[in-house]
Amino acid sequence: METGGLPLELWRMILAYLHLPDLGRCSLVCRAWYELILSLDSTRWRQLCLGCTECRHPNWPNQPDVEPESWREAFKQHYLASKTWTKNALDLESSICFSLFRRKKERRTLSVGPGHEFDSLGSALAMASLYDRIVLFPGVYEEQGEIILKVPVEIVGQGKLGEVALLASIDQHCSTTRVCNLVFMPAWFSPIMYKTTSGHIQFDNCNFENGHIQVHGPGTCQVKFCTFKNTHVFLHNVPLCMLENCEFVGSENNCVTVEGHPSADKNWAYKYLLGLIKSSPIFLPAEDHDFLMSLDLESRDQAWSPRTCDIVIEGSQSPTSPVCSSPKPGSKEAEVGSDGERVAQTPDSSDGGLSPSGEDEDDEQLTYRLSYQVQGPRPVLGGSFLGPPLPGASIQLPSCLVLNSLHQELQKDKEAMALASSVQGCLIRKCLFRDGKGGVFVCSYGRAKMEGNVFRNLTYAVRCIHNSKIVMLRNDIYRCRASGIFLRLEGGGLIAGNNIYHNAEAGVDIRKKSNPLILCNQIHHGLRSGIVVLGNGKGVIRNNQIFSNKEAGIYILYHGNPIVSGNHIFKGRAAGIAVNENGKGLITENVIRENQWGGVDIRRGGVPILRSNLICFGYSDGVVVGDEGKGLIEGNTIYANKGCGVWMMSSSLPHVTSNHVSYNGLYGVAVFSQKDGEFPGGHGAQENFSEDGDAILWEAELEKEDDPLRRPITVALVESNSINHNGASGIFVQSSEALQVVANVIHANGDRGITIVQSSQLTRVANNSISCNRQSGVKVEFQCKVELRGNGIYDNRGHGIITKGDGTAVVENDIIGNRGSGLQLLPRSDTKVLKNRIHSFRAYGIAVRGRVKALVQENIIFQGKTNKTIFQQITNNRECIMQNNKFLVFKKKSDTWRLVNPPARPHLENSLRGSSAAHSGHKVTAMATRITARVEGGYHSNRSIFCTIL
């Protein structure tokens, strides 16, 4: 365009009057004209697109108010798609070479209607030739018999959509046909409006009402800008079919049924449809900014170092036994003076009380140094949460816990990327399914891909059964009266990037050996659970946001066995994850937070592997193991829940190992004997998992799979955990079953380290480090059977051990530096005290209160203050037998005692066995530090808060 010509605005005004062919010719003049034609996007191109009777708004029906990125591009895509049906025209010529010289046959236009050439569609078809155009003028046309299409034709309605109605049953026998701008209704003799078995059919801008459309492979179809009212589209063995920008309303059955494996025989249109799909804008999601980095849980080994414990006076040390005054790297020193820190709360009267702190005080300051390094859990998810939570502060997840975007996940997972990119069977894109029974039903090895659709107000959105596969990308599924997506009988595929919410049943229902990949979805505000896996269902549930559901975020039962990893499950009105009725599952590296009930609830035969999860800020308990619950609970961070960290019933058999349980409002780990049936309200309402109202006998479908990650246990086992800074006791036991508490670090809890109030069978407490708790290290109540062996009980603000148990054994423990007595035996207790090392600064090494049956033998008892006795006995008790004990008294201020041969307990490296040894490389240093502030929170009742589950 030459300089000095017309202004651009005037050129645009002139060009706005041109028709489509003229615009195309002008764009070929030169680059300046080409750019000028492109600049008409929001004016002339928009006008052409919206004025075309063969199409509608490019974003109809889901977003008709949102303009496309380019009106010209949208019009171009529709124009190219509208010509697909004629692509085989050259195939009909006998010779491509001769066709170049043969005179091209002109397409005829046949008019049908009152006052026109033909009165009916049937009569026009009888006279039609190849690729003729049949125009139906406004009116209602009813065919009394089935119409057989034998030659390729184009059937178009004249005028606005709705002005031409056709009541017919058409059977296509030709290679290709196009139908545009018609309202289809079934004839009186058949519900089938259109059927093809081998050819290609293209529908543009049509309405279908109250009938059926059938396409059988190797036939293909291409449907765009159509409305289906109570109409069923049946696709059987189709190799490829496209449904784009369509609306399905009020179906009494399924809107679309895709049945059978895609046919290996393909007609001529297959390659053109495939090319059209690949040339259209890629629908794979771009990178999101609300999902960031993935989890990095690489563990780091920590070398073992020996424990040391030195007791000195005034800091002076023996020249023959030097003690380093500075702590070793990676260790912590705790010093307690004779006046020391005040005990914030005096132990209750049943504990026997402490000696008055002001009585017989020495001016000399007595101190001890305690330096030790112990094994705890491996590095845990959410390590930045290990400090005290700030009251009222908003929860900010560290960057390592923010979810990946779908784009990042697909880049990482090549199999998922291949699924997302595949096109086979039926492609349903940008369609609206509403106000009916079913959306899409895929069965009998069928294949379907759904992108960018909206499913709303249906009974269900998608069903996938009988070895079928679906790919669902970026769909909205909401207000379904049952489950949103339903998979059974080995259904599978990829469900990624969808928004699934406000459904009456589960957002996704997986059962009967179905095995989908559920990736990067938002599943929220459901009236029941977010995802349900049952009846031997499997699946990989990864990197999803599951929140604000009325029941469990993920519910696993009846031998469901999914892999649940890297999800954020939060703000649910029940449990985060529930595993019931013999459910299984590998649950790993999830963030489970702010749920109303337990973060994870395991009961009634549930046996999951719960590993490396962050379970935090719950309004009840972190992990609940109810009646007959089992499973491996390993390497989790259970933090700042208002109830207990782990709540267990004595009838359960979990293996709780290598967890970090801290800053929970009540007990760190609590074991109760109360049955579920005694809870108010029982279990609550049970979810209806039957299909179509029929009872399902899942027990007949058991899968016997040996899982190498699980080791069978016959006694509930709590081992190798770090349990610290919880509001009440670190471990609370009220159990009627046997229990083992082994190799744990129990530190700085708001009450006692371990409280055992009921233990009718043996509770074994071995090789634990119990330190700096606000009251006593261990308390054993009346008639409890307890064995305390190999523990290190240090620097607790009450007594070291208090017992009135019946059959308590205190063997080979180090009870050092506690504010009260090292060991206090209360009336009616029956205790064996063997081979312990006991020391107390302010009180007695061993205090016997009242009539006690005890055997105190071969213990080493260190003197505290020089004017205190080592042993105190209130009454003359012949049943308390003292034999072969060694009492060490300070002779001079420079005396130093050191715990050697063996070194300071616990000796954790010797307590590891079984599966714990398999993970012995996963170690972390847990240091005993002085508690400086009381953790707020009341004391637990005899049951879990809201521990039952719907």
UniProtKB/Swiss-Prot annotation:
Listed Polar residues bias regions: 315-324
A cellular component term, taken from the record's GO annotations: cytoplasm
Modification type Phosphoserine: residues: S321, S326
SUPFAM superfamilies: F-box domain, Pectin lyase-like
Comp. bias intervals (Low complexity): 347-357
UniProt keywords, alphabetically: Apoptosis, Cytoplasm, Phosphoprotein, Repeat, Ubl conjugation pathway
Positions of the UniProt region annotated as Disordered: 313-364
Limits of the F-box domain: 1-48
Sequence ranges of Basic and acidic residues compositional bias: 330-342
Quaternary structure and interacting proteins, as annotated: Component of the SCF(FBXO10) complex consisting of CUL1, SKP1 and FBXO10. Interacts with BCL2. Interacts with PRDM1.
Protein name, as recorded: F-box only protein 10
